[in-house]
Amino acid sequence: MNLDRVIAVRTNKTVYRDGDKCIKVFDSDYSKADVLNEALNQARIEETGLNIPKVLEVCTIEGKWAIVSEYIKGKTLSQLMQEHPEKKDEYLRLFVETQLLVQSKTCPLLSRLKDKMNRKISQADLDATTRYDLHTRLEGMPKHNKVCHGDFRPSNVIISEDGTPYVIDWSHATQGNASADAARTYLC
């Protein structure tokens, strides 16, 4: 694999292009379990029929874990908004439509958002009474099963040359309440 062409640098990872492949190489101290979970999430989302890059392989490169997937030629919505501020409303509409499409799908094998939130509450630096109250409130909420991206932002939507939106970065994907996922998008 040729790792000469860097296309993105993010916390704990660098993304490269090698022809028609995209190679996300994680830092050497990045958890193997987290890499495999991200690849598994992406593979499971492929089965929903959403436009996403297909996982081709998971491997190690010079002792670092990597996910190899299809390269999607295009620009992120974030890039397009910066390059064409006069079209920002059009791009925001496409962004919202894409999130609604993602959230219209179900994927029963994804982890549950409620379980993830329960773990986060348990690990939070809160007194026992507050943790108990939060766990109780969370348990009392209705059960949902919609696909939740978990990090939906304009930099995670690539618009291909033919105008098709592709959603990337499925490391935080869960199934749960689509409104909670939309709220997270709005707050971030």
Give the predicted meaning of each segment.
Residues 4-36, 43:
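ATP-binding glycine-rich loop module of kinase domains
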